[in-house]
């Protein structure tokens, strides 16, 4: 039998070109070093939860943000409410107006409950309806908007102070009292006897009237006629015109407002009106459409 060829030898594996460095052997007689791993650091959330100061800061921050949101909502709602009431007033009196709701309780609470404690309104002083240069200051309290039937709610109390300077009275009389309009060139108020003196040109005619409260309305009673006024303006013709004038001024005042007092000052006239437990009617009046 022929001799068998030796099996092919396995291919030699070349040695690694970059051998991995090995740690130096420990010196003789020395125990090998044991590597001790550091414990894992606790998570940040766990450390925060275990820190009382951090918890307090988080709580304070949350409360501050909540308060800021509530205060912001309160200011915005109050501004909207003030604007709506002012716009409605401007529509009624034909003049600019500003309004503000009471500080307490918060406006949002008043709006949610439908009960408003007090509202203040001030007009610019250009006119109140037909009364030129008149200023109105209104104080409204205890408004309940829980309406029933034909009522939108009730107003517990409404007090109005109307301030009318002499120049405005003269202008209004000239526009609204034809029998006097062309004759009145000057007007003077006398606080001592509570009268208003209407003078014609060059003092040739004088009419003295006294404002009074009669049956919840205003009245101008003729006190004296002098000069040409006594000839051209007989009392029996003048008094009905003054009654009509006073009625026109107040007949369109809303919510059953009635005159309480009228005071003649050195600069004009101040009248005070009021109403209590007034029902707010459901109307199609465009002035109140957006309230």
Per-region residue spans from a language model:
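Extracytoplasmic/luminal low-complexity segments enriched in Pro/Gly and acidic/polar residues
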Residues: 236-291
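Short extracytoplasmic/periplasmic juxtamembrane "stem" segments immediately C-terminal to an N-terminal membrane anchor
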Residues: 83-102
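Terminal targeting segments of Actinobacterial cell-envelope proteins
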Residues: 1-59, 63
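Soluble extracytoplasmic domains of inner/organellar membrane proteins
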Residues: 170-239
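Solvent-exposed coil/turn segments that connect beta secondary-structure elements
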Residues: 104, 124-126, 141-143, 201-203, ...
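N-terminal beta-strand/beta-hairpin edge segment
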Residues: 4, 96-170, 174-183, 191-196
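Aromatic-capped interface at the extracytoplasmic side
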Residues: 70-87
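Hydrophobic alpha-helical membrane segments, chiefly transmembrane helices and signal peptide h-regions
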Residues: 54-75, 99, 271
